[in-house]
């Protein structure tokens, strides 16, 4: 997505 590493 746009945060950490969640795509």
From Swiss-Prot:
Cofactor note: Binds 2 copper ions per heterodimer.
Source domain of life: Eukaryota
Main location: secreted
Cofactor(s) named in the record: Cu(2+)
Family the entry assigns: Belongs to the tyrosinase family. Hemocyanin subfamily.
Protein name: Hemocyanin subunit B
Keywords for the protein's UniProt record, in alphabetical order: Copper, Metal-binding, Oxygen transport, Secreted, Thioether bond, Transport
The keyword Lipid biosynthesis is annotated on this UniProt entry: no
Tissue localization of expression: Hemolymph.
Presence of the UniProt keyword RNA-binding in the record: no
Job description of the protein: Hemocyanins are copper-containing oxygen carriers occurring freely dissolved in the hemolymph of many mollusks and arthropods.
GO cellular component terms, semicolon-separated: extracellular region
Free-text description of this protein's post-translational modifications in UniProt: Forms a thioether bond between 2 amino acids.
UniProt source species: Concholepas concholepas
Quaternary organization: Heterodidecamer composed of A and B subunits, each containing 8 globular oxygen-binding functional units. Heterogenous decameric or multidecameric structures may also be formed.
Subcellular locations according to the entry: Secreted, Extracellular space
């Amino acid at each position: 997505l746009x945060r950490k590493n969640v795509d």
